[in-house]
Amino acid sequence: MALFPQGPDLRIVLIGKTGVGKSAAGNTILGEKCFFSSPSSESVTESCKQHVKKFGNRVVSVVDTPGILDTGKSAEMIKKEIVRCVEISCPGPHVFLLVIQVGRFTKEEKNSVEALQELFGPQANNHMIVLFTRGGDLGDMTIEQYVHKGSKELKEITKRCENRFHVFENTNRGRKQVHELIGKIDRMVAENTHMYYTDEMFQEVEAARKMGMRVIKYKFIAPLQKRILRFHSILARD
């Protein structure tokens, strides 16, 4: 088996709607079944979960989030999971993988990058890659052809991510698709001057952790609650 691409440690956060294959994508990246996945429209990830694996000298952390892009999720649930995501991916993720299923592109996904910028900050898209799942459904079409022939909304999503996208066939046990994704992530990280994503939420959590403090309520909670309302409004927009 080819060696996992070596480099600095990597923190990955998976984001997407319920049922698009986030958990399966996490398992594909890690090369083993760490997250429970099921081909269902019901969420099998109830809370943010993290798995860490060492490949040679490289430590890779993957955070699987519940379907925060589902408009049916309550503001309270989203707040709780964003806090949890920040805590377990501190000091900040190198990449947000926006997971979208081939052949399925919903209203919420059309607005997803803009909504996530509202939630995490305007610079979040500089650290974002679109990861398409169910690549086998493409048939003889390449993912580049799929995006090119797709709707203007799909093109806009990839454009907002500076045309960074990749495709997985989660039933494919070969590691080539994973190594190619890691290569794209590494190039993006290099373009970001090797910096991970951070904002006031990550900075506050990291500062508390360095001081050994157990925080009951972070200062960023109040503004986060307001951003979640705007996030919901953007997602639901036609």
Descriptions of predicted regions:
Residues 1-62, 69-77, 88, 104-129, ...:
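C-terminal non-catalytic interaction/localization modules
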Residues 100-101:
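Glycine-rich, N-terminal phosphate-binding loop of Rossmann-like dinucleotide-binding domains
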